[in-house]
Structures are given as C-alpha cells and as structure tokens.
Amino acid sequence: MAHKLLNDTFLRALLRQPTDYTPIWLMRQAGRYLPEYNATRARAGSFLGLAKNPAFATEVTLQPLERYPLDAAILFSDILTVPDAMGLGLEFVTGEGPKFARPVRTEDDVARLAVPDIDATLRYVTDAVREIRTALTDAQGRQRVPLIGFSGSPWTLACYMVEGGGSADFRTVKSMLYARPDLMHRILDVNARAVAAYLNAQIEAGAQAVMIFDTWGGALADGVYQRFSLHYIQQVVSQLKRDHDGEKVPVITFTKGGGLWLDEIAETGVDAVGLDWTVNLSKARERVGGKVALQGNIDPSVLFAPPAAIRMEARAVLDSFGNHPGHVFNLGHGISQFTPPEHVAELVDEVHRHSRAIRSGAHAPA
C-alpha cells in the first residue's frame, strides 16, 4: 500500500531531481553512540536479540529520527543475516565481533551453500520492514521519511564467510581467491542470487530504497575488484525490482576505498554511488557526469571536533558538490560509537541550513 511521504527529499535526490536542500542520513545512525540504543540493546540481551526481534529493530530504527530531523530511516539489521540464514552459525563474541561456527573453506563447504528461503529464514527482517513502515506513518496515512533496506555485497559477505569472522589482512579469503578462483566464483554466485532475493523481499515488504554495502571491496587489487566484487554487484543490481507500489525504488552501492573505480561503479545500473572521505566530491561529480547521484562523504572523525569545526567541514563538503541535483549527504563510513550525540545535531542542522542557502543563491560555492 502506497503512503504519502511528508518528506521525499532523499528519494528525489537519489533520482537526481531538484530539492530545496541536501538530504542527510548517516550510516549506522541507529547505534551505540545513542544512550537510548544501548538501553534497548540491554533489554534485548544481545545484538542478535535486538536484530532478530522486529519490535526492538523498529524501536532502534526510529531512535535517531526522534533526536534529529534526518531525511531517511534505515532498517536496523546486520549484513551477516544472509550467511547466517545459509546455516553458517553466526554469533557475536564480546570484544571480537562476529564469528561463524561453520566457515566456508573447502569444496564440500561450497557445495553445501545454497540461496536460503528468505521467507522461512529471514522473516524477522521483512517483518521489521513492515513494522517500521507502519511506525513511520501517521493516522492519515502520511509517512515521515522513506525507509532504506540494505545488504552486504557478495564479496563482502564472502570475506566473513571464508575468514569465519572479521580479518585484518583477509589472508584466508584472498588465498582462496588466488589459489581456487573457481571456488570463490561459486561462493559469489550463490551470494549474488541470495542478496538479490533478500533485497527484493525487503522491497516487497516496503523498503523504498536499497543499499549494497561493499565494505571490503577496497581490499582488492585493481582488476581483481572488477572480477570478484563489481561483477557480482552488477549481477545483484540487474535482478532487483526497481518499481514497487507505482514508485521507483532507487539503488545505492558503496565500496569503501573504491574511489579509483567510481566510473565503473557508476556503470552498474545503480542510481547512486556512496563515497568515502578520500574522494574529492567535486571531481567525482565531474567524473560521473550526472549519470548517478552521489552520497557522502564527510570523515566520521569530524564529529569529534568542536561544533564550529563540524559546521565548517560540512559546508566544505556541500560547497564541493555545489548547487547541483543528486547529492545525499552522509558520512564516508559508519558513525563511531564514541561520537557525542549533540555533535550529530550540529552536523544535521548545518547541512540543512547551508544547503538551503546554496539553493537560494544566498551562498555561492567557491
């Protein structure tokens, strides 16, 4: 069922349509920097207890929107839900992060991999999407802001699946990639089909935009990235539903460390490309030539600076992009758990204030 969006600025920016100001949301905007998030997580008992309970997931998704006038909500979940649904036995170990009880390292392990039944294994995610959409909507059927769904990229998921958790050097997964590229391609093919099915299920449930997080694409060499990450992102994008309930569903992809490949990422069929803080936004806009919207890209560490410095850096990002359609303001990576919440308020306010001044002509970017 379609709802009237009270604020569609984010979706319009993704589709490179004119907006009155630059919309902003933050990667990991529902997270440990917020005391209310930590209180809800304590009630849930664990991270997975939070992520797998639609009521808790809805609660924490909405928390940043209660504090800040953000222009989009993003589903609270984790990129590792998909390999968990494949039966790899996900757990979060205190102080160590995610671990898989059954990593994928042998021919037999790969042979056992299959696209999970999304409705049977990941129903808690689609239920959360529906509950969040309901919670964002008032009695008159008006929805506050759009909801973003997401998944990890096939390569990024493979990193965790083969390593058995996080890694500093990706030795195990890269060893497989170079020694047994056939096995790696089989893993990535399953992952691509699973990610596409997962994102389509989120769209069916009510996600109004979706994002593919290629967190570890930047760990790959040039040439290797194209074959083992970008190719499979393109495979996912080609399978996605791009319209639902009569509305376009924009697709964003973000390869951390992927500035070198911006032109190629822009050719995958996505509507927007996320950028980390190492990329010059003005040059990036010239490179993509209006083909895609751009999302980003302030350094998350700016949020540890005093308010005046935060505002100055926000203006610099906005001035770099200039008075053009197709910019969504975001961090260049996820927000740190140590970020002072009041500093986020300064950032959101300055992005809205300064971008309105740029649009009105009251401020001309240098």
UniProtKB/Swiss-Prot annotation:
GO terms for molecular function: uroporphyrinogen decarboxylase activity. Catalyzes the decarboxylation of four acetate groups of uroporphyrinogen-III to yield coproporphyrinogen-III. GO terms for cellular component: cytosol. Its EC number is 4.1.1.37. HAMAP family: URO_D. Belongs to the uroporphyrinogen decarboxylase family. InterPro entries: UROD/MetE-like_sf (IPR038071), Uroporphyrinogen_deCO2ase_HemE (IPR006361), Uroporphyrinogen_deCOase (IPR000257). GO terms for biological process: protoporphyrinogen IX biosynthetic process from glutamate. This is Uroporphyrinogen decarboxylase. Substrate binds at R28, Q29, A30, G31, R32, D78, Y160, T215, H333. The lineage of its organism: Bacteria, Pseudomonadati, Pseudomonadota, Betaproteobacteria, Burkholderiales. It catalyses: uroporphyrinogen III + 4 H(+) = coproporphyrinogen III + 4 CO2. Its main location: cytoplasm. The record marks D78 as: Transition state stabilizer.
